[in-house]
Each structure stands twice: as C-alpha cells, then as structure tokens.
Amino acid sequence: MRLFKEKLAWAAPLAVIAIIALFSVNLFAQGNPQVRNLPVALIVNDEGANVDAVSSAVQQMSKGIDGEEPMLAFTIERESDIEDLFHDKKYYAALVIPEGYNDAVQHALENNSPAALQVYINQGYNITGANAAKAALNGLIGQLSNKYSEEFKAQLGDQKIDTDQAAVLVNPIVSQEK
C-alpha cells in the first residue's frame, strides 16, 4: 500500500514510457526518407548526337516520376569551376561529358575500348547525399550503356566478334569516378 502512495515510485515508469513514446514517434516519422532535388552539376565538354542522348537522358531524369519531385536537380556548369563549387557545397556530384566522348561512342567497337563518362563526387558535402547522387548517376550511365549495347548488337547482326569487342558490346559506356 505504501508503494501506491509514493509519487516517486510512479514517476520512473511514466518517464520511461514517455521516453519510449517520444523515440518511437521520431522513428516512425523517419520511416522512409526520400531523396529529392539533390543538386548535381552537368558539365558538357563535347558535341554530337551521343552527347545529345546523354543530355536528353538527364532531362528525363530531371522530370521525376508521376509528378513527384526528381531525385537529382541538374545545373549546367563549367569544369574549371567545379572545385570551387564543391568547396562551397553547392553540388553533391557532377556528371562530366568529356571532350571526345561522341567519337569514343561512335568508334567503341572499332577501338575495342568503351566510352567514359566522368562522375565527380563531393564526399565533403554530405556523405549520404553524395552516395545517393553517385548511385543515381551510375544508374543513369548503366541505362545509357544498355541502350547503346542494344544498338550495337543490332548493327553487328550475325557478325563474329573477338573477346575485346564482346566486352565493349556488353558495356559500351563506363563510369570514371573522381
């Protein structure tokens, strides 16, 4: 009986319940965080149809799905400014279309070497955001690579190819991370 009369004996269990409730509400609110509108720089150092294909893929990615905000928000910048922009924490990452990319894609099977798109990652900004941007950009490059792989397969038809050409045929565009 004395236990029920003491106010301090009731305070400890109530405080524990209140703390547990507070943390569960906090975890429930963070249940499924969505990455939206991460700023990413697009740096175009080349011209041509294959560069336009990358630009149109970037525009598609910038639209979002079903009216939702896109994961990445692209802005065109110059490569010479990227270090300062990363230092100022303006971008999580940058997708660079290097000079000679258009020719590298057109002659990938002849040269037995895949074309490369460069991905710069700003790990100093926010590692979670940088990793999300990196994954999204690598996914974009993978989609472009699959598209060109199908086109190259259609062009080759029943021709015999060597192992180097087969490697390029499977992965005609690669990502170079910096």
Residue ranges and their predicted role:
Residues 2-178:
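Extracytoplasmic/periplasmic domains immediately adjacent to an N-terminal transmembrane anchor
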